[in-house]
Every structure is written in structure tokens, then in C-alpha cells.
Swiss-Prot record:
Function of the molecule: Displays ATPase and GTPase activities.
Residues the record lists as binding GTP: 60-63
Keyword Nucleotide-binding recorded: yes
Cysteine disulfide links: none
Top-level taxon of origin: Bacteria
Protein name from the UniProt record: Nucleotide-binding protein PFLU_0879
Record's keyword terms, sorted: ATP-binding, GTP-binding, Nucleotide-binding
Stored InterPro entries: P-loop_NTPase (IPR027417), RapZ-like (IPR005337), RapZ-like_N (IPR053930), RapZ_C (IPR053931)
Molecular functions per Gene Ontology: ATP binding; GTP binding
Classification via SUPFAM superfamilies: P-loop containing nucleoside triphosphate hydrolases
Nucleotide-binding as UniProt keyword: yes
Pfam families: PapZ_C, RapZ-like_N
Residues reported to bind ATP: 8-15
């Protein structure tokens, strides 16, 4: 059996996450009272129609505060049944959450005539503290549109061929901000930039002319060797410590050339020695 618990602040994308999981064969329950989590898991284990039932539930600030406080104990009870359980926590910065509520004109579940929207969001953060601390995977949706969020959930949660730590090597551009959910970040902006070559400007690190240009630069090769040596040494230690997800982010200025090239090469190297290595280019469209 596989159980995914979806949580996060209101407006961060929990409904989208449940829709993606439902589209991929999960039986989904929105706003499950946290106290019912062990009972739900027990019932799913004896489900007769599915050999490996897939269940996803959302647990958020609509729960009783006393249930949320007990979440660590409840999660421990579920995992004691040897259930493959992931806790996904979605979030966005406060400015983005305020903007989303303004655009949709929906009411925050904790809002009241005597509590502003900003205060409701702050209170929600405190209530969800026990879940935040135990999240296996955190996805910040601040800069993600609906389709990017759907892709991110499918990539991180549904495309794991084998159990164990899931590694994501991701390229990005600093001009659009650092990935806030990255565990390791490498800044490669000091390397020669193909952008300043007119014939390469409109191409990306996936294109052979750009790859050939970067491969011929000694600094690029040295950077690749240093990063790959570090990752090959230390990522197995992350896996040994029972980490469910590890994100490695490689950043250049625009996220089109240097970071893409190095991310591709690093992904190829890591896939030879580690299981569940995925590659993503955040700022390539």
C-alpha cells in the first residue's frame, strides 16, 4: 500500500495536488480528520479489490488543533504498519498567498471579521508546524503555474521506479530566484557564458553547439569534476540517513546554458551509481 498525505497552507495548491494524484489512480480524501489516519490506513490494508491500494489524503488547518498536535504520533502509528507513507507539504510566500486569495475571492478557512487575511495565514502556519517538521517533500509553488505544479508532483512523487531516496538534479536561473526547496545549491555563474556568443544565444545547454562550446572550456570541466566528486561522495550518505527526497540545484544567470549543460552531465553520472535520479530544467520552456 502507498499513502500520500498532502498538507500545506491554504492557497498553496493542495487541491491541484489531489487532482493529479486522483488522475493517476489514487483514492483521494480531502480534509481528512487527522485522528482517523490510522483507522484509514488499517482499512486500506485489508482492501480486497486492489493488491497495492493507492490512497492520498489532505490534512490541513481545517482540522481540530488537538488533532494536528497529535500528528507526529498518528504518523508513527501508520508507519508502524509498514505502509509506504509520504508527507507532501506545499507552500508559497505570503505575498503570493495573499495575491491568490485576492484573485479568487475565496475565504481563508481561518479568517473572521476580527482577523485579517495576513493574520489568518500566520495562525495557519503555527497550526501546521507539526506537519511541516515531518514533511518528506516540500514544494514551494510561489513561481509555479498550474501546469508546472502538476508536472512537479508527477516528477517527484509518481516517477520513482524503485523505493529509496529520490534525487532530483535541477537547473535554474538566478534571475528568476533560487529554488527554495533545494537541499544543495551550486552557483556556476563564474563560468564562460555562451549567451555572449551570438550564434549560441538562442540555443540551450541541450543543444550540441552549446555543449561543444562548454566542453572545450577548462573551467567548465574543472567545475563539473569538483561537483560530481562531491555528489558521488556525499549523496549515498543522504540515502543512508533515510532521506526520502534530495534536490540538487545548479544555477546560472538565465537557466538556459551553463546550468542546463552541467545538470545534464551530472544527471548522467549520478544515474550510473544511484537509483531514482531525475533531471529537470526549471527555466527551459
Amino acid at each position: 500500500m502507498r499513502l500520500i498525505i498532502v498538507s500545506g497552507r491554504s492557497g498553496s495548491g493542495k487541491s491541484t495536488a489531489l487532482n493529479v494524484l486522483e488522475d493517476n489512480g489514487f483514492y483521494c480524501i480531502d480534509n481528512l480528520p487527522a485522528g482517523l489516519l490510522p483507522e484509514l490506513a488499517e482499512r486500506a490494508l485489508i482492501h480486497t479489490e486492489l493488491a497495492q491500494p493507492l490512497v492520498a489524503v489532505s490534512i490541513d488547518a481545517r482540522n481540530l488543533p488537538s488533532h494536528l498536535e497529535r500528528f507526529p504520533q498518528l504518523l508513527e502509528e501508520v508507519r508502524a504498519k509498514h505502509i509506504h507513507c509520504d508527507v507532501l507539504y506545499l507552500d508559497a510566500d505570503e505575498e503570493t498567498l495573499l495575491k491568490r486569495f485576492s484573485e479568487t475571492r475565496r475565504r481563508h478557512p481561518l479568517s473572521s471579521p476580527h482577523r485579517s487575511l495576513a493574520e489568518a495565514i500566520e495562525d495557519e502556519t503555527k497550526l501546521l508546524g507539526p506537519i511541516i517538521d515531518l514533511a518528506d517533500l516540500k514544494i514551494n509553488t510561489t513561481s509555479l503555474n498550474l501546469y508546472q505544479l502538476r508536472d512537479a508532483i508527477k516528477l517527484r512523487l509518481l516517477n520513482q521506479p524503485e523505493p529509496g531516496t529520490a534525487f532530483l538534479v535541477e537547473s535554474f536561473g538566478f534571475k528568476r530566484g533560487m529554488p527554495v526547496d533545494a537541499d544543495l545549491v551550486f552557483d556556476v555563474r563564474c563560468l564562460p557564458n555562451p549567451y555572449w556568443k551570438p550564434e549560441l544565444r538562442d540555443q540551450s545547454g541541450l543543444d550540441q553547439p552549446v555543449a561543444d562550446y562548454l566542453a572545450a572550456q577548462p573551467d567548465v570541466e574543472e567545475m563539473f569534476q569538483d561537483i560530481s566528486s562531491y555528489l558521488l561522495k556525499w549523496l549515498p550518505r543522504f540515502a543512508a540517513s533515510n532521506r526520502a527526497y534530495v534536490t540538487i540545484a545548479i544555477g546560472c544567470t538565465g537557466g538556459h546554458h551553463r546550468s542546463v549543460y552541467l545538470t545534464e552531465r551530472l544527471g548522467q553520472v549520478l544515474q550510473k551509481t544511484l537509483k531514482n535520479v531525475q533531471v529537470r530544467h526549471r527555466d527551459l520552456s
